[in-house]
Every structure is written in C-alpha cells, then in structure tokens.
Amino acid sequence: TTMLVDIHGLLCSGTVKDIIGEDGAAAAYIGRIVPAKNGIVYKCEMSCIEKPAGSNTSFDIDLVSSAHSLAEDVVYDSGAGSLELSLIAAGGDWQVGMRKMSAVGLNWANLPADYIYLANGSGANSGGTYTAGKFIIKLYGANF
C-alpha cells in the first residue's frame, strides 16, 4: 500500500509525540490498516519528497500507529492499553530524498486494524502550521 501525504496546512503542537493533523480534527489519522486490503503488514518505509516547512513546526516527524482513532494535538502513546506503535522514528529533521525504514525486529502483532498517524518527533517547537512537506509512505503486507 502506498500513501502520498501532503502536510501543507496541518497543525503541529509543541509537544513531543502529539498527533499532527487538521485543526480540531477529531480523527487525524492519515490511513487505517485493513487486513483484507493491506494484508498483514510486516514492514514500512517513509520517504521525503518535499522538505517540511512552517513557523514553529517540527521537521522531525515520526510515523506511528494506534488502535484508537485520535484527534490532532493528542499524545499518541498515552499509555491507554499500550496499543500504540512507533513505526518509524525520524530521529531528526527530514530532508528531500531521505528514506527511513521500520526497525528490524519491530513487533507488528498489534498492528491489524490500526490507524496510522504522523506525530511530532522532537517537541522542540512551540506549535504552528506547516506550509510545505510531502511524504511517500509504503506499507508492505501479504494476504494469501
């Protein structure tokens, strides 16, 4: 499954692990894993094709999942049942041409039917709106 994500106009709070999304959106996910459509996901990758930009926004953006539908500006791993998974931790600012893969040994067992989100990876900003930023996200799954 390939997702093309444009973050222009989305909000980023100043809190690490907060969900990035539309202002006040009750459901800020960028996709949902459906085993009948995506298969059993076993790997993912994220590539930057336009560098994130915006005043007071984080360019360190993580790809995460949760069993819950979460709103923008909510911490994705609130500890509510430990049903969250950090799929890709950027570990720094995204640049055009960068590609990150999910970690080897990541436990995908809790992923079926999860919601996929972008989250603030650093918390080193005060919060703002993105004016640019595009990513290609690929989920690798099988169902046969």
Regions found by a protein language model. Give the residues of each.
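Surface-exposed, low-hydrophobicity beta-strand/loop segments enriched in small/polar/acidic residues
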Residues: T1-F144
